[in-house]
């Protein structure tokens, strides 16, 4: 038999003491003491009834009368009332007696400054709330309302739909202005657990804590500018920063001269003259360059192929670079329009910005036709001498590439030289007109060409006597000998002409006096030796040293070197191109090597395990042991070859290469 003992002070009442109290009335099976009540199990029903009758109202402690009765199972439905702001002087028995005046109280528990009272009937609970809410008990106004748990559910009762937090319509009677509380969001209805059918209400809006941009699973799509993967472009920036120049120079087919230069640097230009098909050389000279005055300065400076090739291959040829490209890629000192004296389509006659300007009629150059220098310097050895009409007419008897030139007589075209623009050679600080006749050889002149006379110009280049005829400057070659191809010219024919031509071919087009004055014969000899036919180069080596030395430096050092060595020694490697002779790629070109290099170079992103003294660091007392530092960009970004992020991000490919994101991705979650 189970006996309920109420109003027990659980703090100072032990089960043994309570069992000794019930022992005289029968056998006590067990005794359990709770906070303010206890349960005693007795074997015999008669002994239990005797104990209830004798001990009910007994004071185990002074002032605390026990409530002893048969234990009853709790009713299936009770109404739980919350009583707040309970005074510390109010006991559970006093609170129970206060509520029992309004109805049967099943249970009353006081916890600190609040209490819960369970009443059997709903009407009694509502009456108690209405009467006792705001009532002063032991000096404090109590707050009485239905508990948030509402009605205790029996096993057969359905779950209430709608608001779970408060009883529907139950307002605060102490403050009548407030109606029944309703939750702002009904989770059961929103997530499909509503027991009722469709009630006509629209679905409530999603609560704000899982907004689209805050959800870890569903982010806003990245902006379109970042969607394109960066692998589309880094190859252009990493390996060949100058797209048209580098790619064409490295990878163009044999249509461009760059391949010829790269594969056979010794006799590159001679080989290109011998081996190039007629499409690449003859057709531009024959068709495009037939009318030199019709070409614009930009087309002229684009090189031997003019408009016949796309800009990539045109830029990759020798004379065909623009101003910046040719200064990077040509023989080392050549400007855009003079980049190679062999390949320019409109060297001195057809270019508006780089021809030789207004010179006197007696000048050796004005006897050339405007289109005579369109051919290579090697192919028209007679172009620089003041040749007679008969000798220059021999050009008309050459291949069809010169037949298309507008003038039959070369010395009849002195007018185009007088009509050139101010950017031509006439605008240079020291024109050729002002050269005195005193200097007989170019090497013996301490000053630049500004000090030379007009009349002996032809002789001054090859260190020949002024009195000799123009044919003498070409090695006394007969005019018919000029019709031979570039590779077939005799050594004697090439001797004088290269002495004159190479100097012009190696000069930039901007100012001629200063380059002639300051440029040593090293770049001239090297650029000449690196590109000529071996036969022509041998004839050039046979020249006296002072015939070519503009600055008075002997060229024997360059002549004793092999042509490849001269080319390697004197050609400044272009900063943006890679040739066969280029050094191996830096780690900057490879994103994975770059990542390792970056992580070693910048200490903030360096991993501790990569340090040589990592063991000593971790064993020292002053080191803060922490996991290896993780860069903020580790696995989210692709290598961005030219961004500043690469400097500070360390090895950002270490962890998850498959999850690399674009460079604008948010770096910290």
From Swiss-Prot:
Tissue: Expressed in all tissues tested, including brain, heart, skeletal muscle, colon, thymus, spleen, kidney, liver, small intestine, placenta, lung and peripheral blood lymphocytes.
Positions where N6-acetyllysine occurs in the chain: 164
InterPro entries membership: Nucleotide-bd_a/b_plait_sf, RBD_domain_sf, RBM14_RRM1, RBM14_RRM2, RRM_dom, SRSF
Cross-link (Glycyl lysine isopeptide (Lys-Gly) (interchain with G-Cter in SUMO2)): 126, 135, 138, 149, 153, 164, 600
Quaternary structure annotation from Swiss-Prot or TrEMBL: Isoform 1: Interacts with NCOA6, CITED1 and XRCC5/KU86. Isoform 1: Interacts with SS18 isoform 1. Isoform 1: Interacts with SS18 isoform 2. Interacts with STIL and interferes with its interaction with CPAP. Interacts with gamma-tubulin. Part of the HDP-RNP complex composed of at least HEXIM1, PRKDC, XRCC5, XRCC6, paraspeckle proteins (SFPQ, NONO, PSPC1, RBM14, and MATR3) and NEAT1 RNA. Interacts with RBPMS; the interaction allows cooperative assembly of RNA-bound stable cell-specific alternative splicing regulatory complexes.
Protein's name according to its UniProt entry: RNA-binding protein 14
Protein's cellular compartments: Nucleus; Nucleus, Nucleolus; Cytoplasm
Stretches assigned to the RRM domain: 1-73, 79-149
Keywords tagged on the record: Acetylation, Cytoplasm, Immunity, Innate immunity, Isopeptide bond, Nucleus, Phosphoprotein, Repeat, Repressor, RNA-binding, Transcription, Transcription regulation, Ubl conjugation
Phosphoserine modified-residue sites: 161, 220, 242, 244, 256, 272, 280, 520, 523, 527, 562, 582, 618, 620, 623, 627, 643, 649
Residue list for modification Phosphothreonine: 206, 572
GO MF annotations in UniProt: mRNA binding; RNA binding; splicing factor binding; transcription coactivator activity
GO CC terms: cytoplasm; nuclear speck; nucleolus; nucleoplasm; nucleus; ribonucleoprotein complex; transcription regulator complex
Domain of life: Eukaryota
Location of the region described as TRBP-interacting domain in the Swiss-Prot/TrEMBL record: 307-354
Feature: compositional bias, Low complexity: 287-303
UniProt GO BP: activation of innate immune response; apoptotic process; centriole assembly; gastrulation; innate immune response; mRNA splicing, via spliceosome; negative regulation of centriole replication; positive regulation of transcription by RNA polymerase II
Physiological role: Isoform 1 may function as a nuclear receptor coactivator, enhancing transcription through other coactivators such as NCOA6 and CITED1. Isoform 2, functions as a transcriptional repressor, modulating transcriptional activities of coactivators including isoform 1, NCOA6 and CITED1. Regulates centriole biogenesis by suppressing the formation of aberrant centriolar protein complexes in the cytoplasm and thus preserving mitotic spindle integrity.
Residue ranges of the region described as Disordered: 147-175, 193-232, 284-303, 566-590
PROSITE patterns: RRM (PS50102)
């Amino acid at each position: 038999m189970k006996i309920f003992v109420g109003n027990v002070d659980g703090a100072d009442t032990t089960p043994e003491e309570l069992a000794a109290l019930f022992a005289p009335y029968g056998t006590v099976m067990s005794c359990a003491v709770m906070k303010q009540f206890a349960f005693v199990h007795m074997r015999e029903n008669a002994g239990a009834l005797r104990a209830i009758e004798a001990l009910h109202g007994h004071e185990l402690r002074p002032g605390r009368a026990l409530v002893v009765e048969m234990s009853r199972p709790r009713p299936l439905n009770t109404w739980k009332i919350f009583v707040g702001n309970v005074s510390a002087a109010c006991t559970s028995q006093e609170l129970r007696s206060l509520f029992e005046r309004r109805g049967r109280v099943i249970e009353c528990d006081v916890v600190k400054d609040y209490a819960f009272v369970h009443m059997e009937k709903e009407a009694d609970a509502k009456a108690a709330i209405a009467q006792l809410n705001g009532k002063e008990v032991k000096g404090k106004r109590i707050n009485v309302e239905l508990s948030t748990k509402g009605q205790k559910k029996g096993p057969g009762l359905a779950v209430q739909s709608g608001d779970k937090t408060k009883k529907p319509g139950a307002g605060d009677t102490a403050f009548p202005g407030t109606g029944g509380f309703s939750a702002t969001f009904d989770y059961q209805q929103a997530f499909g657990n509503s027991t009722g059918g469709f009630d006509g209400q629209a679905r409530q809006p999603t609560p704000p804590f899982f907004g689209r941009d805050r959800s870890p699973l569903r982010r806003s799509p990245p902006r379109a500018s970042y969607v394109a993967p960066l692998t589309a472009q880094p190859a252009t920036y990493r390996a060949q920063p100058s797209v048209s120049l580098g790619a064409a120079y490295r990878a163009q087919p044999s249509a461009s001269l760059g391949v010829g230069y790269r594969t056979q640097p010794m006799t590159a230009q001679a080989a290109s003259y011998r081996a190039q098909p007629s499409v690449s050389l003859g057709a531009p000279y024959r068709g495009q360059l037939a009318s030199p005055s019709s070409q614009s300065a930009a087309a002229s400076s684009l090189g031997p192929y003019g408009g016949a090739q796309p800009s990539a291959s045109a830029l990759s040829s020798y004379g065909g670079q623009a101003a910046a490209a040719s200064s990077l890629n040509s023989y080392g000192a050549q400007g855009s329009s003079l980049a190679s004296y062999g390949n320019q389509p409109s060297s001195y006659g057809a270019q508006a910005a780089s021809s030789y300007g207004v010179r006197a009629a007696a000048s050796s150059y004005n006897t050339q036709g405007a289109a005579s220098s369109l051919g290579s310097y090697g192919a028209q050895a007679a172009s620089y001498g003041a040749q007679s009409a008969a000798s220059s007419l021999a050009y008309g008897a050459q291949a069809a590439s010169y037949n298309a030139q507008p003038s039959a007589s070369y010395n009849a075209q002195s007018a185009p030289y007088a009509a050139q623009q101010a950017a031509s050679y006439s605008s240079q600080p020291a024109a050729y007109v002002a050269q005195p006749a005193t200097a007989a050889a170019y090497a013996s002149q301490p000053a630049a060409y500004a000090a030379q006379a007009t009349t002996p110009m032809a002789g001054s280049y090859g260190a020949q006597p002024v009195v000799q005829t123009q044919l003498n400057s070409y090695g006394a070659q007969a005019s018919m000998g000029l019709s031979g191809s570039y590779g077939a010219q005799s050594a004697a024919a090439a001797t004088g002409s290269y002495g004159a031509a190479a100097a012009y071919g190696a000069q930039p087009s901007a100012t001629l006096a200063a380059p002639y004055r300051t440029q040593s014969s090293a770049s001239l000899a090297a650029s000449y030796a690196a590109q000529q036919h071996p036969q022509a180069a041998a004839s050039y080596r046979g020249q006296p040293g002072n015939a070519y030395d503009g600055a008075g430096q002997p060229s024997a050092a360059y002549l004793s070197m092999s042509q490849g060595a001269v080319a390697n020694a004197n050609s400044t490697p272009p900063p943006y191109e890679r040739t066969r002779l280029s050094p191996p790629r830096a780690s900057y070109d490879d994103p994975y090597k770059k990542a390792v290099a970056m992580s070693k170079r910048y200490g903030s992103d360096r991993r501790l395990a990569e340090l040589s003294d990592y063991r000593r660091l971790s064993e020292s007392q002053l080191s803060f042991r922490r996991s290896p530092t993780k860069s903020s960009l580790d696995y989210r970004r692709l290598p961005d070859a030219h961004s500043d992020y690469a400097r500070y991000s360390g090895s950002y490919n270490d962890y998850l290469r498959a999850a690399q994101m674009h460079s604008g991705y948010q770096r910290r979650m």
